[in-house]
């Protein structure tokens, strides 16, 4: 069976504002299956932004587990992320899931991987997915050389990634916490 490919998810934190955005393309082999998938969401009473890349079903499974961890730990993003990463690494069924998450609240942004890593990005900028490197490079350049807001940086970074990555389209969803 062919693998689902790609997406681009990027997050930018500047001051007390954070933006998280992603494109909407889902690809199976060389076919675009859907152009308007929603891979960025608000969870935990709209206090946490989360974006996912990887297998769509896998990502939804992880998203449900992450939201349960947030509930269990009263919205403590770091603790919920560490607990999810522990489960992901040690549970046989979860280990097979192929996805990555970026989660952000008012004060913290984290990348959560299937290897059990919970990463706090340097400079408040991170990106995942097939177009992640393009988006992250664009976001860093824009953050260092402009006064654009996090939302504007995310939007422009996704535009650049969509121009360069065949698995990323220009149908963007961006959420912010200010």
Curated annotation (Swiss-Prot):
Database matches in SUPFAM superfamilies: N-terminal nucleophile aminohydrolases (Ntn hydrolases)
GO MF annotation list: metal ion binding; threonine-type endopeptidase activity
Highest taxon of the lineage: Bacteria
Subcellular location field: Cytoplasm
Record-listed Na(+) binding positions: 162, 165, 168
Principal cellular location given in the protein's record: cytoplasm
Entry's Gene Ontology BP terms: proteolysis involved in protein catabolic process
Active-site positions on this chain: 7
InterPro entries given in the database record: ATP-dep_Prtase_HsIV_su, Ntn_hydrolases_N, Proteasome_sua/b, Proteasome_suB-type
Cellular component aspect of the GO annotation: HslUV protease complex; proteasome core complex
Record entry for activity regulation: Allosterically activated by HslU binding.
Reactions the enzyme catalyzes: ATP-dependent cleavage of peptide bonds with broad specificity
Group of enzyme by EC: hydrolase
Record keywords, A-Z: Allosteric enzyme, Cytoplasm, Hydrolase, Metal-binding, Protease, Sodium, Threonine protease
Subunit field text: A double ring-shaped homohexamer of HslV is capped on each side by a ring-shaped HslU homohexamer. The assembly of the HslU/HslV complex is dependent on binding of ATP.
Task of the protein: Protease subunit of a proteasome-like degradation complex believed to be a general protein degrading machinery.
Family according to the record: Belongs to the peptidase T1B family. HslV subfamily.
Name of the protein: ATP-dependent protease subunit HslV
Natural source organism: Burkholderia ambifaria (strain ATCC BAA-244 / DSM 16087 / CCUG 44356 / LMG 19182 / AMMD)
Lineage, opening ranks: Bacteria, Pseudomonadati, Pseudomonadota, Betaproteobacteria, Burkholderiales
Gene: hslV
């Amino acid at each position: 069976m062919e693998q689902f490919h790609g997406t681009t998810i990027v997050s930018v934190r500047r001051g007390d504002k954070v933006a998280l955005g992603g494109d909407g393309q889902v690809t199976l082999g060389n076919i675009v299956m859907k152009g308007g998938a929603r891979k960025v969401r608000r969870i935990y009473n709209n206090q946490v932004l989360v974006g996912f890349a990887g297998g769509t079903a896998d990502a939804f499974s992880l998203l449900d587990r992450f939201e349960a961890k947030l509930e269990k730990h009263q919205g403590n993003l770091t603790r919920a992320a560490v607990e999810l990463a522990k489960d992901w690494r040690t549970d046989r069924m979860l280990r097979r899931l192929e996805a990555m998450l970026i989660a952000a609240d008012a004060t913290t942004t984290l990348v959560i991987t299937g290897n059990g890593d919970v990463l706090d990005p340097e400079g408040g900028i991170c990106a995942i997915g097939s177009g992640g490197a393009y988006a992250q490079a664009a976001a860093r350049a824009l953050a260092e050389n402009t006064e654009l807001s996090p939302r504007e940086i995310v939007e422009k970074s996704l535009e650049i990634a969509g121009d360069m990555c065949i698995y990323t389209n220009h149908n963007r969803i961006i959420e912010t916490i200010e």
